[in-house]
Regions:
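Anionic coordination/interaction segments
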Residues: 1-166
Length: 166
């Protein structure tokens, strides 16, 4: 396993990784559960325009219009895109108030370290290849964040987030 893969999956448990089809918002997706337990991998999203988007399972993104010289995010190799998580693409940081009046800072999809609270991560891509959905659940906070990536001829790269109670 590469050092990059080890950084994002330090305690690899391949038995936890499963795949299945599911319906999400009325569309068919293929979901990989516990995707963070395997080495990072590269994906592409397609659309009806000249926009291209490549995204790593770490969250790093490269995208542009027509060709590499018109990149919106830096056009790098797969390993550099994977390492770019948190610098390219999206970043979510949530301040969560607890019943005892304390505040917890939660950064979904960040690299986990020993001693961090348990998280459940899933990754789903629709069968047309137009939408990619990252989901992280923090059971201790009772929260789930779903982040969807899509391309749009009109709006370009579209990232949407949905925070729900579980």
């Amino acid at each position: 396993m590469s050092s990059q893969a080890a950084a994002f999956a330090p305690h690899v448990d391949h038995s936890a990784v499963t795949g299945r089809s599911l319906d999400l918002d009325g569309r068919r997706f293929y979901q990989i559960s516990a995707y963070d337990q395997i080495p990072p991998f590269f994906m592409t999203l397609v659309g009806a325009s000249n926009l291209w988007l490549f995204i790593s399972s770490t969250g790093g993104v490269t995208a542009g219009r027509e060709h590499a010289d018109r990149a919106l995010f830096p056009y790098y190799t797969e390993d550099k895109v994977a390492e770019g998580a948190g610098r390219t693409g999206g970043l979510s940081v949530l301040r969560v108030g607890l019943p005892d009046a304390s505040v917890v800072c939660w950064q979904p999809f960040a690299e986990t370290r020993p001693g961090d609270p348990a998280v459940e991560r899933n990754l789903a891509k629709d069968y047309l290849g137009t939408t990619l959905v990252f989901t992280e659940t923090r059971a201790d906070l009772g929260l789930r964040l779903r982040v969807a990536w899509q391309t749009s001829a009109r709006y370009g790269v579209v990232r949407s987030c949905e925070l729900t109670s579980v």
